[in-house]
Amino acid sequence: MDTQPAARRVLILGGARSGKSSFAERMLAESADTRPVTYAATAPRYPGDAEWAERIAKHRAQRPSAWRTVETGADPGALAELLRAADGPVLADCLTLWLTSAMDAVDAWDEAAWAAGRAPRRLGVLTGSVLAAFAHAREPVVAVSNELGFGLVPPDPGSRRFRDELGRLNQGFAAAADDVWLVVAGLPLRLK
């Protein structure tokens, strides 16, 4: 199966530990574009969480040494800026953690802020900006995201809101993408 990113914009979806990140990394590593990849790490750092730090270190160690890592987790606006300024291929991993940071930044977990409309407006600005940056990217971009819609309905409003917002974000990225893949149990399936 040809997995070369001939397309400029690629979205790779999958569940937790589905192999989606490995597939994205392989896709870019095997690309005909030999320029170094910028790896946009959207995960925030959690001081004192040794297991999380170990995960980050493991991911970093398995990427090619020529790749440049840019951590965007502390600032949800940084991913859109990086996509607009890119001068080579970008791997954005992952939109799920990006959305977590964005929702943190706009108090989207707070029921009163959400009900008053402040949080949805502010979140809309952030999601609109990152989606526009992806849609108009001048360089190849491979974006990775979780597909949460296959699971159970979350029991609390904040978790349901997150699932719904991620579903909308994934739909926006899929509409703008040239190629969309779903990875299940390490097996990639081209959707678009």
Name each model-derived stretch.
Residues 48-129:
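Conserved inter-motif catalytic segment of the P-loop NTP-binding fold
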Residues 35-38, 88, 140, 179:
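Residues at the starts of beta-strands that form the adenosine-phosphate
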Residues 11, 89-91, 142-144:
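Structural motif
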Residues 2, 6, 10-84:
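Conserved P-loop
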Residues 24, 59, 91, 146, ...:
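Residue-level signal for inorganic ion chemistry
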